[in-house]
Amino acid sequence: IGFNRRFDPNFAQLKKSLDDKEIGKSELLTITSFDPAPPPVSYVKTSGGLFRDMMIHDFDLSNFIMDELPVTISAVGHSLINPEIGAAGDVDTAVVTMIYADGKIAVIKNSRRAAYGYDQRIEILGAEGLLQAENIVENSVVKSTEAGVLSAKPKYFFLERYMSAYKAEW
């Protein structure tokens, strides 16, 4: 298929829970997909751009979760991180809103920079509850003190984050 995220165990469980009507009818899907750092501009020039190279995986995941194709799509993006990416004709930060035939909404947020690691989350609001697939982190220890709360960072990049999805797909 080439779209491995639907094989991620956490995303697959979220989809199963949705299909099993555990939160009722879906209403609002939010997909967050932030890379830890932008690619080299030389890559950007040949990649097809953020929408075709990066967000395409989120388009597939959204349509897989919603079980249909959208009827309306709107997008906005800008080059906020590196002006050279903009000069190459691409954006590094974007939001897409997709409306489905029955009125469900999907919002996809992409950025080429998240200083804290590879941020990959899904949240879906239903008529009877909320499903969330959170980041896969380096470890699950959370330290809480009077100074604040500290936890591990997300996995660094897609190979580490989606290793189990690649294995499940093949």
Predicted regions located by residue number:
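Beta-strand scaffold of nucleotide-dependent catalytic cores
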Residues: 26-29, 107-110, 133-135
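Alpha/beta-hydrolase-fold catalytic nucleophile elbow
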Residues: 32, 76, 125
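Rossmann-like dinucleotide-binding domain that binds NAD(P)(H)
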Residues: 38-105, 111-116
